Amino acid sequence: APFYGESSMLMYRKDLADKAGITVADKPTWTDIKALAAKIHNPPNVYGICLRGKPGWGDNMAFLSTLVNTHGGQWFDMSWKPQLESKPWKDAITFYVDLLKNYGPPGSSANSFNEILALYNEGKCGMWIDATIAASFITDPKQSKVADKVAFAQGPQMATTKGANWLWAWALAVPAGTKNADAAQKFVTWATSKEYINLIAKSTGWATVPTGTRK
């Protein structure tokens, strides 16, 4: 039973965008993102953009796949021939490296979700493109110094709108050989029910409800 789902999106400092005189579109392009990053980049106080740079499939490659997609690239062609040396891949990687080199924080190659979350909550990131779950943390005044200055937009586009954001899902299952199958099944049913969702929302707020089930 699915209990959690997320996508990716743009999270940005609306106060900095307003100060720069830039209105962020609901569906921005990567050209828009680069222009805004240049305007609000003010190190060491604020870095124009923060992106995952730590190597790994669940790290920078999760993000890079969406960037390559929007440049019109793909991992394989229809004959399963790798496309890593194609022009869209080269364009996307060059854009990514230049963006972080010019407008990202120092040490970006070691940053993944948790490192960037800490930077964002300290007010060090002007923009961040990452998992939608981050909204729960960066809008929480108990965790974030800029909770009241955050705005959101869809994943940036470039040559195409296809694949501009990712989609992940997690699910609960009961193993066939479990000794307490009935109890486990009842728990899974409850933990994925509207009753559970409303209970969490009432107890601790909608921001703590599993993503993909929020109002």
Each predicted region: which residue ranges?
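Paired acidic/hydrophobic, glycine-rich loop segments that form the ligand-binding mouth/hinge
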Residues: G126-A131
